[in-house]
């Protein structure tokens, strides 16, 4: 009878290990209740900002375990658009303290779920007030999707009338803040009240868990629908006192697409023309920023303005053209920072504390961000502390002046960022200060090698030959090669002028022909002068090729006369002084003579 007891012992131990400890329970199993929920849905920009003030109560009996955390849920329709989620609770000093939020999964339930750790475990019957902030991107959809320059922009937002929660809610209300008072339509659940640009829903009582009812509003919204589709931020750290920052930004207006043509005249004359377009925006740079530049593919953009304030540097960025719906632009902003404000060290231990992403414009949305942090050559034991989850790519190497084995580059990626992501990232690394002498020593060594090479070169004779005749032949060959190049350029001038004559015959624009003549005369004169100069050099060298070049010059003068004669014939044809048949016959004769002269010139060139 001993054997069955021995077999049951491992099973009992396993069950004891999986059993919940006294005073602990999973958040979804706790009897928590939302006593009161007040939601504010801010749709005044192109972002949807939802703030929920929740009074959470522990509705269990005195024997129930304490609640150390609770669950937050997001609707399946909005989960993919979530950019930021934060939970705060007011402390004793009335300051809002952020709570730890970790994503989790609930079997059999759709949507995203998060576990929020409370600062103090909640006893049965106790309550706590928390504030939940969420920011969604690309949830305000333009409708209609295309508008003309003079039309206003309307958008549609779809959400939930109820606070989506795994717990029952006793009472809840919702206030919707719109961008304007012009509202096309909105859902009427519970007879909402409307005042100017506000919609008030509720209170709704005794709402079951996971309740959903579609809330929809269609209203005017002309706020800037500006989106950074892609951004690359490069931070280059130098231990010589400077940190260089450069941002490559791809911008797009993600509002209603412009339908029809764009009128610059109407845009300047009528204040409400293109009301949803973007003329300019302000970027806030660090207060210590200096040597600021702003450029695009064309070059430096002079329409920007820089304002230095006490706590920041304000830069007004004005693209070369206003941005309408669907329009894109690309630009680069760069500046330098003193390293003593962001780089700290203790011996060989260094810590760089900078923002992963900085302010670009108000209510910013960044679809895709790539950050590259270039550390000094020789940095090792690199560690990155980020305030939120980022995707690290394999480290790279960057080579610049006087580098030997490359500078380590930290590469990080992040998608769907908003202003709440403007937080500091800390990079720890070790660096041997002796390596700071590497670059100065390389410069000294380079100059030493240069001076030594010059000394050797001056004192030694590296000439291959002392034959004067061979040197003279080399000089003549070099001059001949230059003559060939110049002659080919002159022939190219004649072909280009032939094209000008053809365009003149089609457009009948005398200015086109006159401009072509002037260009031909100037360039031909310059080329002929250079050939004459080379001819005199050949004569100085005593080469018999001088006579051939002289003959070629005479033939070229005849070719030029025939080319200009073709232009005169074309003018007579366009003016009606010459019949077309006669013009064709004359043109054939001129072309034949030109071809003969060009053939003679080619024979001379072959003989050179």
From Swiss-Prot:
UniProt crosslink position (Glycyl lysine isopeptide (Lys-Gly) (interchain with G-Cter in SUMO2)): 539
GO cellular component: a single term: oligosaccharyltransferase complex
GO terms classed as biological process: protein N-linked glycosylation via asparagine
Transmembrane segments: 436-456
Segments on the Lumenal face: 25-435
Main location: endoplasmic reticulum
Glycosylation site list: 300
PTM annotation, UniProt: Ubiquitinated by the ECS(ASB11) complex. Ufmylated by UFL1 in response to endoplasmic reticulum stress, promoting reticulophagy of endoplasmic reticulum sheets.
InterPro entries, per database record: Ribophorin_I
Sites of N6-acetyllysine modification: 188, 539
Segment forming the signal sequence: 1-24
Tissue: Detected in liver (at protein level).
Pathway(s) this gene product operates in, as recorded in its UniProt entry: Protein modification; protein glycosylation
Name of the protein this chain belongs to: Dolichyl-diphosphooligosaccharide--protein glycosyltransferase subunit 1
Organism encoding this protein: Sus scrofa (Pig)
Upper taxonomic lineage: Eukaryota, Metazoa, Chordata, Craniata, Vertebrata
